[in-house]
Structure formats: C-alpha cells, structure tokens
A protein has these predicted regions:
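Soluble catalytic domains of membrane acyltransferases
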Residues: 54-130
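A transmembrane-helix-recognition feature enriched in membrane-embedded lipid enzymes
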Residues: 2-60, 112-113
Length: 130
C-alpha cells in the first residue's frame, strides 16, 4: 500500500500540485498587483488546502477557537516537514505574511506572487543585517 501511495504522490499528486501552484501564482500576479500585499486570503487558502488534499494528507486542527482573526500574532513554524507551510497557511484564520529567505524570490511565478502578496524576503547572507 505504501508503494501505491508513493507512486500516486509522484505520478499524480506532484504534477497536479505544480499546476495548482502555477495557476495560483499567475492568478495572484495578474489579479492583485494593486492590492499592495492584500491578495485575498481565499486564494492562499485554496492553494494550501488543494495541495494537501491532492497529496492525501489528513489535517486535524485543534484549538483554532483560541485564535482571534482580528488580533495580531507572531506564528513560528518549526518545519517538521515540507507540508507545515500548507497546513499553517490553509488552516489558520489570520491573514498573515511569511518571512522567507530571499532566494525564494527567484522561483519563477511563485517568487513574484509572494512579493505581490506582501511576504517578506530576508537576506541571510549577512546575519547582522538580517
């Protein structure tokens, strides 16, 4: 069964995720450049939840009722896996901005979409400046 799951992830899930990511990035770039970092949260949630759905990753969220969407917070993800970004993005009710290494800005479409959405790129080459 595990072999079938891995085959599904690479042969079906991954190509679909690449297409969803491209579509979402292009949609964000074209439709929301004037929003000054305020691309609709629905676009971000759609992307995150779609990725996890196509990878067949179950998500169980507890304690969301303790998070006030109108209050400011600092969320810190400790990267237990590559999927924590999607889980946080898709299931936290707050409209937040990621801090990410500046190298991610160079990813075609995705880097531009992140900039349009108002995410923050950090230059980690000089720890004092970062």
């Amino acid at each position: 069964m595990k072999v079938l799951y891995i085959l599904y992830q690479y042969l079906i899930g991954l190509p679909i995720i690449i297409l969803i990511t491209l579509f979402t990035a292009i949609f964000t770039i074209i439709c929301f450049p004037w929003k000054n970092g305020k691309a609709p949260r629905a676009v971000q949630v759609f992307w995150s939840r779609s990725v996890l759905w196509f990878l067949l990753v179950p998500i169980k969220v507890t304690g969301r009722e303790n998070v006030n969407p109108k209050q400011s917070y600092v969320f810190v993800a400790n990267h237990q896996s590559a999927l924590d970004v999607f889980a946080v993005y898709g299931w936290l009710p707050n409209n937040f901005k990621w801090m990410m290494k500046k190298e991610l800005r160079k990813i075609p479409f995705v880097g531009t979409a992140c900039a349009v959405a108002g995410h923050i790129f950090v230059d980690r080459s000089n720890p004092r400046a970062a």
